[in-house]
């Protein structure tokens, strides 16, 4: 079962999505600890989420761990599941008010990064880490570094 979760295709371009998604989540997670009043607990309190102190640290830790795993291509599918959930919650909690008050186009403009990360996470869950990932090495799939 673990081998099936780590199994990936031979796609050479998956690394682009993996690096983008991993870097964004790693950066966002670090910011939740470095700037808690504007990126972590303070932000969660402002939008009305319960227990913002715990939630800020919890989400930040998941973003850091998932971001690192995705960057490495290690347990990529599993690491992308928390990022998918984080993005669904982020869109539902922060963008629904914008949609209601400012309209569809303002909401779409304000959530373009959220949608990109959501779709990137879905892609990684479906495809895995790609040709240049630790997942591929751990499953014994042969990786060549030629183009």
Give residue spans per PLM region.
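Extended, low-polarity transmembrane helix blocks
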Residues: 1-35, 53-61, 65, 72-147
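Membrane-interface interhelical connector segments
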Residues: 34-51
């Amino acid at each position: 079962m673990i081998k099936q979760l780590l199994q990936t295709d031979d796609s050479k371009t998956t690394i682009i999505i993996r690096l983008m998604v991993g870097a964004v989540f790693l950066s966002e997670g670090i910011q939740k600890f470095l700037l808690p009043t504007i990126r972590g607990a303070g932000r969660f309190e402002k939008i009305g989420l319960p227990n913002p102190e715990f939630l800020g640290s919890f989400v930040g830790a998941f973003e850091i761990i998932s971001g690192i795993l995705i960057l490495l291509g290690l347990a990529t599918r599993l690491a992308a599941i928390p990022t998918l959930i984080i993005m669904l919650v982020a869109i539902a909690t922060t963008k629904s008010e914008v949609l209601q008050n400012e309209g569809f186009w303002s909401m779409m403009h304000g959530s373009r990064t959220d949608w990109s990360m959501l779709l990137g996470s879905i892609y990684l869950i479906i495809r895995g880490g790609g040709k240049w990932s630790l997942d591929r090495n751990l499953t014994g799939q042969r990786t060549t570094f030629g183009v």
